[in-house]
């Protein structure tokens, strides 16, 4: 098992909380849907060992915080900084649903046209050619597209929108 991705997931969970977990597993799920041999790929990922590694690295800090601060930590970190920011507008940071599409174009300047071209090409190949679903040479493009769309969709549904929320897509 390659433990490096699981270590980075744990670091993401330590720095950003459950959002890191949600983004990774939304990406992973959508990526698996694009592959004919998704079961074989799932075995290679070794989900149970990976999740155990992630849990062992990230959980001690959360447990210590809960023991030291109790409900204050729970309400502040999970309640306010995760749930409330996602479900309601905080600090007047309301934007329309397409806000991150604009950020996508703006953040990728001056290469926006290449990004859009790559997205469109990958979508076309994914839809039109069934053989792409088993080719490993295209996997990085498909995974990147799944990652980009997962971040874009997740944060587009968020009530509070900040340009910095887009950073995980980069």
Where in this protein do the model-derived segments appear?
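Transmembrane-lumen/periplasm boundary regions of multi-pass, lipid-linked membrane glycan transferases
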Residues: 7-8, 15, 20-166
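Substrate-binding/catalytic cleft of secreted carbohydrate-active enzymes
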Residues: 4
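Membrane-interface transmembrane helices that cradle and orient dolichyl/undecaprenyl
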Residues: 1
């Amino acid at each position: 098992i390659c433990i490096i991705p699981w270590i980075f997931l744990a670091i993401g969970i330590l720095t950003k909380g459950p959002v890191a977990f949600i983004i990774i597993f939304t990406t992973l799920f959508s990526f698996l849907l694009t592959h004919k041999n998704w079961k074989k790929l799932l075995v290679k990922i070794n989900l149970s060992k990976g999740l155990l590694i992630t849990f062992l690295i990230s959980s001690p800090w959360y447990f210590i915080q809960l023991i030291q601060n109790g409900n204050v930590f729970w309400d502040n970190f999970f309640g306010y900084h995760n749930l409330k920011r996602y479900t309601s507008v905080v600090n007047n940071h309301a934007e329309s649903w397409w806000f991150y599409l604009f950020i996508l174009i703006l953040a990728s300047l001056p290469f926006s046209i290449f990004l859009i071209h790559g997205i469109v090409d990958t979508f076309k190949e994914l839809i039109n050619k069934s053989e792409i679903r088993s080719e490993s040479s295209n996997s990085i493009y498909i995974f990147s597209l799944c990652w980009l769309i997962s971040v874009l969709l997740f944060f587009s549904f968020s009530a509070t929108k900040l340009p910095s929320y887009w950073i995980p897509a980069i």
